[in-house]
Design a protein with these regions (language model features):
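Conserved catalytic core of nucleotide polymerization and phosphodiester-bond processing enzymes
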Residues: 1-166
């Protein structure tokens, strides 16, 4: 408990956002619209979920608040507990997925994407275009989507005959 208190007092902005996300869970239950972020790129949408910047939604099916004040939602395997910190994690992962999805679309304009692993994209490129392909792919991965102008993105890349050798 001491570690948690020290972390929260040392990182008040994060702790405040987690608390805000608990109010977002209440808004979802009440079917009210609430902004997730100051730029209002993400908002709760009544009867739908949290709208993400690219138009997709993050949903918590059958979200309820228990008598003890906890939140839970239905999954295929039962009910899962959810809370502000977990919503923050889900939002970060969802936005990262939106970004890498747009990056893959841009890369696909020139090179075939054959695999993604978390935040990594693997492509098959002609050997004689390897350096040019690397530059193009890095440029695509460093370019934020239109809805995230100014977001600092960076990447590292490697080239090899097999994915395991990168």
């Amino acid at each position: 408990m001491l570690f948690r208190s020290v972390y929260r007092s040392s990182n008040a902005a994060i702790s405040n956002w987690w608390n805000h996300l608990n109010t977002v869970l209440l808004a979802l239950i009440s079917n009210k619209e609430v902004a997730i972020d100051k730029a209002e790129l993400m908002v709760t949408t009544p009867f739908t979920g949290i709208s993400l910047p690219n138009g997709l939604y993050l949903n918590y099916p059958d979200l309820v608040r228990t008598t003890s004040g906890d939140f839970s939602y239905q999954t295929r395997t039962g009910r899962n507990k959810i809370y502000g910190g977990k919503v923050a994690e889900n939002l970060c992962q969802a936005v990262a997925r939106c970004i890498i999805g747009e990056q893959m679309i841009n890369i696909e304009k020139r090179y075939r994407v054959v695999l993604t692993v978390h935040d990594a994209i693997a492509c098959v490129v002609p050997v004689d275009e390897a350096d040019e392909a690397r530059s193009y792919i890095e440029e695509c991965m460093r370019t934020p989507p239109k809805w995230a102008v100014g977001l600092p993105l960076n990447c590292e890349s490697g080239m090899a005959q097999t994915y395991g050798d990168c």
